[in-house]
Each structure stands twice: as C-alpha cells, then as structure tokens.
Swiss-Prot record:
Protein name: Probable alpha-glucosidase Os06g0675700
Highest taxon listed in the record's lineage: Eukaryota
Glycosylation sites: N195, N378, N397, N467, N477, N576, N844
Region forming the signal peptide: 1-33
Species per Swiss-Prot/TrEMBL record: Oryza sativa subsp. japonica (Rice)
Record GO biological process: polysaccharide catabolic process
Keywords linked to the UniProt accession: Glycoprotein, Glycosidase, Hydrolase, Signal
Length: 885
C-alpha cells in the first residue's frame, strides 16, 4: 500500500547508477503515482504552478481516502538564504500553522510579479538556492547554486489526500549526508541513524524511553555534507511547517514525510555553515528568548518534598556544603489537592511559604513552582469558577471536555481562545500576590490526560496511523480527543502539537506583564518557535549511565531547534541513582545551559551534598560554571541575536573535520570551550577528540593538546574531575566563584587569553542587569565589549585590546579587570621578566609564569598571570606585556 516507504532511488554510485536514476525520474508514471504540472506562472524569484492528479484515475492507496485532484504550488526565494515551497489544495482551504504562532510572509505577497508562462527555475545572482520544477510527472529539486549539489530531490509519487500527505526526497549516498534534528525523541546518537522513523505527536511518554515520540514536535533537520560537489562541511536546513501528526522516515538514501493533515509547507535554509543555518532558521521561527542571568545558576528540585521544613533543610544543606544553589523549586507537592494557583494549607501554608521565599530573595536566590494546564472541576475553586464564567475551556461534543489529571476531573484552557491568555494572566498575577515566585514551570502540556477518550468520529482514528508510542497507538492515547474543538472551530486533530507552545507563550506574557522583568518559563511540551518564550528540559529521564549519555544528544538537538536553554534532570529522574553516577552527572550537568537536579517521588534522595564524593564533584564543576557565568551569559546574547546554540556539536566550529560529525560524547559551549565528560562507570580516564589547534585546560591553564590535525587523546579523569578545555584563539571573561550569581557579579574580572598557533585570540562580553525584558533592545541599558589579543616581535610582546561596541550599562564603567592570564606563550629562551603597559603607561603589575613542564610544544613558555591590574571593562584599553631578557 502507498503508506509503505518507497523503494529508495539509486545511490549514484558510478555512471550506471546515475543512468538508472535518470531512467527512474524520466519514467512515464501511471495513474497511481503523483501529479502532473498543468500550468506555471513565474518570475526570477517567484513561481506558482497548478498540479493535477496524474492520469485522471482514482489515485493512490484508496484505503487512505480520495486524492485531492488539483493542487496549488507556490515557490519563492524569500531571502538570499531562504526558499519557501508550499503545496496545498487548489480549491479548498486547509489547516495551516496560524500566522500568530509563526509570523511569516504570505506566499501571495511574493507572487504579485509572476506571469503566465514564466520559467520553471527560480534562481538569482544573490541566492545560493535554486528551485526547479519538473512537469510530467511533477517533482521538484532544490540545488546549491555555487556547487551544484542537490539538497532536496523529490520523487514523483506525491500523495495528497484530506488526511494523508506523503512526499519523498532522495539523498546522496550514505556517508555524504549527515542529518540531525527531527524531534523530540531520546536518541542513542545525535546524528540520525538510517532506517529510523521519527514520529511527531506530542505525548506524555517518559524520556527514559528511546526512539519514541516524546513531548515536543520539531519537523526540522540539518544536513551536513562531506566531500563531493558540495564541498566539505556545507550545511543546509529543511523545515516542514506543519502541526499535524506525522512520521518522518529516514532511510539513509531518502527521507519520506507521512503527514495526517495540513499542507506541505517547506522552508529551505542555505547555510552554508551550521551556524548560518540556525541563524536563518531562527530568523523565520523567532529568536530565542533572553533568559534572566540568575537562570544560569544551579537549580534544585524534587517531586516529593514533604513540607516547608524540607525545603528549608535543602537550602541549608547546600549552604553548609558550600555548593552553589541559585534556585529552589517545588513540584506539585506544594499545591492544595494538586490544584493550580493554590498552596497546601497544612504542609506548605502561605504564612510559612512567604517568609521562606522572602529569605531566598534576601540571599540572592530564587523560587520556581510547577503548574499544570488541567483546572479542577470544583465549584468551590475560584480558578475554575472564573474560567467557567469566561468560557475558556476546550470543547468536545458540545460541552467542555472532561479529562482526568492529578487533581481529578479537569477542564483544559483553550489557549487558541484570546480570553484564555487573559484568564491565565490574571490567575498568575493573583497567585504571585500570595507567593512572589520568580518563574513558572509548565508541565503535562502535551496535553497529558489519564484517561483515553473514546473515538467520537473519523478524525479520532484517521486512516493512516502514525507510529505513536512506537506501536501505532491511537492518537487519543493519554491525551484529549482529536475531535475536541478549539476556539474558532479548530480541531484538536490539527492543533494538538501547538498546545505546549501556546501555554508557554501565555505564561511568558503573563509573567512579563505582572513583573515587568524578563520572564523565566520552563515548558515540557514544545513546538517550532517555542524558544521565543521558554526553556526546556529533556523530561522524565532515568537514573542510568545510558541516559547520562543520551542527555547530550537531546541537548544538542534542541540547540538546532532554537531552544538553547536546555538541560536534563541531573542524577536522573526515575529510579534510584548511585553515588558514582550522580558524581559524574553533576560533572556533565554543570555545563548544561540549564542546570537542574530533579528526581521522582519515592526514589533515593540525591541533593548534591548528601554524598561527600558528589559534593566534591559539585564544588569543582559548579565552581567552574559560576566562574564562566559571564561567558555563558554572553552566549545567551549570541543565541538571542543570531539563534546560535549555547551548547554546540563540535562540527559547528569545525565543519571541515568529518570526524566531528559523529561525536556526541563531547560538546562545545560557544565556539571554543570543550567539555569531555566521563559517561561509563568505573572509568578513571576519558578518550576525547581534539580538532586541530591548541587546547588549554580550564583548571590550570596549561597547554594540554597541540595538534595540526584532529586526534583522540586519553586524558586522566579522576573521580571528582571533568575535563574542560578552551581552544586557542579564544578570550574568555571569568569572574570569581560564589554561591549565587549575584555575588559572582560583584567580583573582579579575569581575562583568559588562549593564543592560537598564529598568536591571536578574540572574545566578547555582553553585560546588562540580567533581568530587563529586552536584551540589547532600544529601551534597555547594555554594554558589549570585544577583546583581541596578538603576539608581536616574534612572540616577545603580547597585546590585548578592548573595543567598546556599545556602553549604556553603567556598572561596566566600574567593573575592574584585575588579572589577565596569557596562555600559550612561546619563547626561544626564558625571559628575565615582564614589563606591563596599560594604554602606553607602564604599570606596577605582578607577573608569574608556569605550566610549561610537560608541554606538547617546543619552546613553550607556558602561562603568564598578569595580576594587580585595574582595567575598566567599560573603557577601551590597550594592554602590552613585554618579555625582557
């Protein structure tokens, strides 16, 4: 039947394969295959075509419903780096992702200049993407103009029915194309593996399950090509903007989309670098929201805290152990009978909770609580009564849909209804008057439902069953019925995958309105563009060594999806962790963008101070994280303005190194901080891959690896240590470790200058108050400083300069750089000393040299610590360090 994967096209291995592929694409397809092009109108960058069902017969796979007989295709080069191709019913409107979810140009706005009989190729001198339509049978290709590399090459067997759409694109031979993305799933590898099906239907399935559809839907992939006509490391992106359920089948030499509704709305992003792809992608879907500075600290949570005294004991335990604790969280335990916007009057009464939160705030700490979408059906519950009065709940069969979640019977707000967002905002504001929480965690928003609603009509059980839960369960399983009706008559069938996005947006906007400060929202369910409003965590993982590794894969995937504030439950959520696993997990988790310890009720407690070995690891790893806070926050600025992930795969910085394409046991923070964690029990070493260049330890600043080509190195990994290195060519801004970020921000600044092999280095620093709603906006105060370093006079002189790009944040004018660490110095002979000049004036700075012993480079001088400086961050400076002989 047509629902099966098509036979993959020939793999282009040699002239015979090319010839056979040409025959395949030129074959006279019968009535059961695809469409023909009836007419074309176009200009050089816009095209419109009418497609008609081939042969006039009954079409393909009649068991899936009748084919739509006439289709409309629009293609437009919307920017120099973005191509939009949309295929829909020519005669009847169909559901599409709403404009207010992803604001985007209408295809019609690009088609005014088209003319009948226009060309069948879109190509401009400024765009690297070329679109070509082939007429009989219909198919289309997307090509990189600069190299001729075919990026997307559809086969002629397009299927378009009311509730089943299928399209296949061939791919280069396995080994040339490396694909990443298509989530949300827990995957064993970051790079997608062939012969796998990626199902997109938001579901409450624990993240400890591998290869199943989880909480979010992101029909986007990045393709990085190696060798061939495209050149090494050229990347592009493909988005199918569709909120309906789907299976995406990656067969190695092809990718097939099987979608149960909506339209085929494709966007192609030219890259060619991986960073350029995410820049172009987030230009369309929206830039990631700026996160408050404090959210980059360490967070502690547990499902199962018993009362306020339990919370107080945890906070005290961290303080006594001298382990940073930025944010305390509570799960649903704090609620009165699990009802949103309430406090348990016995265990978490307001007269105990308010002083507890006030004490956190006085100590520079924050408090976050969970809320769920289900509103308990209870006429004595004010939130329910107000929701009923405003008529904002999801409908089914003419009435409010009745589900069951933690508080029992519930109704669910319909966030497509404008009144629902207003209702939500008022409830949040009223709750914050009782308890001034600093952020909100929105959970169970797939929507999760403890009962399976029976099918009401055909859309509850469509003719094609996607691979829901890995066993093709009905789409109503553990959620609300697909036949439920949203505001405006929208079926849940179409809007299901949007619920988490819409709730996160409403929560973000409510916090912004109530506090006037930058919101912090953590959402379990996400969709394309959710990063504009929310952070995400990987969900209910398991306390296993496998999940420790898999957390890196999910973290890197969400960086591609435009949600850079991402992390996993440290030490594992489900099941009992072990001391060794927890120790190694905090070593990794300290470098997640979002770093939180969280565990399930009934499992062994795992606060980081409970085992001394874990506490040692936590102090060491979190101590380094807190020193790196200025760097992490600057990466947040980069993410907010360009879409760049905070945590990145190695190929983002080294796209020409094919060895990096399969690496998912290490990752980069930004462009040059490499984290190489231990991921197996009993290990005392770790084998890490180092791309070409110089790599310095971030613990003692010594040169650890110097290589002209990438190589694997076995490193010591003592029980309390995670290997973290910085690549030569980077300048990092550090501050002094403390137990809260507010204390860190008051400390002196250090510059780490890691010189590349050519003696140069660069870096950036972004500063603001960490909580203004805008980050680098016209109404906010902020400073941006660029640093550069270079050796002169054969290496005997090192110059470090700053350039103030923007300076309206007053504290930058008083922040002092007290030390500059120069890493990677070389000298033919040891110098007698150093002379230090600031802005041309010699200063009385102290200089110490060390770290040359055991260096992998000849002539290595090691590390020079230049202390006693008083350089002002917000004022440009020119620091010159001269070796004297």
């Amino acid at each position: 039947m047509m629902g099966s994967p098509p036979a993959p096209p020939a793999r282009r291995l040699g002239a015979l394969a090319v010839f056979l592929l040409a025959l395949f694409l030129a074959a006279p397809w019968g009535v059961d295959c695809g469409y023909n092009v009836a007419s074309v109108a176009g200009s050089k960058n816009r095209l419109r075509a009418r497609l008609e069902l081939a042969g006039g017969g009954g079409g393909a796979a009649p068991e899936l419903g009748p084919d739509v007989r006439r289709l409309s295709l629009t293609a437009s080069l919307e920017t120099d780096s973005r191509l939009h191709v949309r295929i829909t019913d020519a005669d009847h409107p169909r559901w599409e992702v709403p404009q207010d979810v992803i604001p985007r140009p209408s295809p019609d706005s690009f088609l005014a200049a088209t003319r009948p009989g226009g060309g069948r190729v879109l190509s401009t001198a400024t765009s690297d993407l070329t679109f070509a339509i082939h007429t009989s049978p219909f198919r289309f290709t997307v090509t990189r103009r600069s190299t001729g590399d075919v990026l997307f090459d559809t086969t002629p067997n397009l299927v378009f029915k009311d509730r089943y759409l299928e399209l296949t694109s061939s791919l280069p031979p396995p080994g040339r194309a490396s694909l990443y993305g298509l989530g949300e799933q827990t995957k064993r590898t970051f790079r997608l593996q062939r012969n796998d099906t990626f199902t997109l239907w938001n579901s409450d399935i624990a993240a400890g399950n591998v290869d199943l559809n989880l909480y979010g839907s992101h029909p986007f992939y990045m393709d990085v090509r190696s060798g061939g006509g495209g050149g090494g490391g050229a990347a592009h992106g493909v988005l199918l903007l569709n909120s309906n359920g789907m299976d995406v089948i990656y067969g190695g030499s092809y990718v097939t989309y099987k979608v149960i509704g909506g339209v085929l709305d494709f966007y192609f992003f030219a890259g060619p670098s991986p960073l350029a792809v995410v820049d172009q992608y987030t230009q369309l879907i929206g830039r990631p929201a700026p996160m408050p500075y404090w959210s980059f600290g360490f967070h502690q949570c547990r499902y199962g805290y018993k009362n306020v005294a339990d919370l107080e004991g945890v906070v005290a335990g961290y303080a006594k152990a001298r382990i940073p604790l930025e944010v305390m969280w509570t799960d649903i335990d704090y609620m009165d009978a699990y009802k949103d916007f309430t406090l348990d009057p016995v265990n978490f009464p307001a007269d105990r909770m308010r002083p507890f939160v006030d004490r956190l705030h006085r100590n520079g700490q924050k408090f976050v609580v969970i809320i769920d979408p289900g509103i308990n059906v209870n006429t004595t519950y004010g939130t329910f009564v107000r929701g009923m009065k405003q008529d904002i709940f999801l409908k089914w069969n003419g009435s409010n849909y009745l589900g069951v979640v933690w508080p029992g019977n519930v109704y669910f707000p319909d966030f497509l209804n404008p009144r629902a967002a207003e209702f939500w905002a008022r409830e949040i504001a009223a709750f914050r008057r009782t308890l001034p929480v600093d952020g909100l965690w929105v959970d169970m928003n797939e929507i999760s439902n403890f009962v399976d609603p029976p099918p009401l009509n055909a859309i509850d059980d469509p003719p094609y069953r996607i691979n829901n839960s890995g066993v093709r369960r009905p789409i109503n399983n553990k959620t609300v019925p697909a036949s439920a009706v949203h505001y405006g008559g929208v079926a849940e069938y179409d809007a299901h995958n949007l619920f988490g996005f819409l709730e996160a947006r409403a929560t973000h906007d409510a916090l912004l309105r109530d506090t006037g400060r930058r919101p912090f929202v953590l959402s379990r369910s996400t969709f394309v563009g959710s990063g504009r409003y929310t952070a995400h965590w990987t969900g209910d993982n398991a306390a296993t060594w496998e999940d420790l590794h898999y957390s890196i894969n999910t973290m890197l995937s969400f960086g591609l999806f435009g949600i850079p504030m991402i992390g996993a439950d440290i030490c594992g959520f489900g099941g009992n962790t072990t001391e060794e696993l927890c120790s190694r997990w905090i070593q990794l988790g300290a470098f997640y963008p979002f770093s939180r310890d969280h565990s399930a009720i009934g499992t062994v407690r795992r606060e980081l101070y409970l085992w001394e070995s874990v506490a040692r690891s936590a102090r060491k790893a979190l101590g380094l994280r807190y020193r790196l806070l200025p760097y992490l926050y600057t990466l947040m600025y980069e993410a907010h303005t360009t879409g760049a992930p905070i945590a990145r795969p190695l190929f983002f910085s080294y796209p020409g190194d094919v060895e990096t394409y399969g690496i998912d046991r290490q990752f980069l923070l930004g462009r040059g901080v490499l984290v190489s964690p231990v991921l197996e029990p009993g290990a005392t070493t770790v084998t890490a891959y180092f791309p070409a260049g110089r790599w310095f330890s971030l613990y003692d600043f010594s040169l650890a690896v110097a290589t002209k080509t990438g190589k694997r190195v076995t490193l010591p990994a003592p029980a309390d240590t995670v290997n973290v290195h910085v690549a030569g060519g980077n300048i990092l801004t550090l501050q002094q470790p403390a137990l809260t970020s507010s204390r860190v921000r008051q400390s002196v600044v250090h510059l780490l200058v890691a010189l590349a092999d050519d003696g140069t280095a660069t870096g950036d620093l972004f500063l603001d108050d960490g909580e203004s709603p805008e980050m680098a906006g016209p109404r906010s105060r902020w400073s941006q400083i660029k640093f550069s370093g270079a050796t002169e006079s054969g290496g005997g002189v090192v110059r470090v300069r700053s350039h103030v790009v923007h300076d309206s944040y007053a504290p930058s004018r008083t922040m002092a750089i007290g030390k500059v660490v120069l890493m990677g110095l070389r000298s033919a002979a040891p110098p007698k000393g150093f002379a230090v000049y600031a802005n041309g004036v010699q200063v009385n700075a102290s200089t110490a040299v060390g770290g040359a012993a055991g260096s992998p480079e000849k002539g290595a001088l090691g590390v020079a610590h230049v202390s006693g400086l008083t350089l002002v961050v917000g004022q440009e400076f020119d620091l010159k360090v001269v070796m004297t002989y």
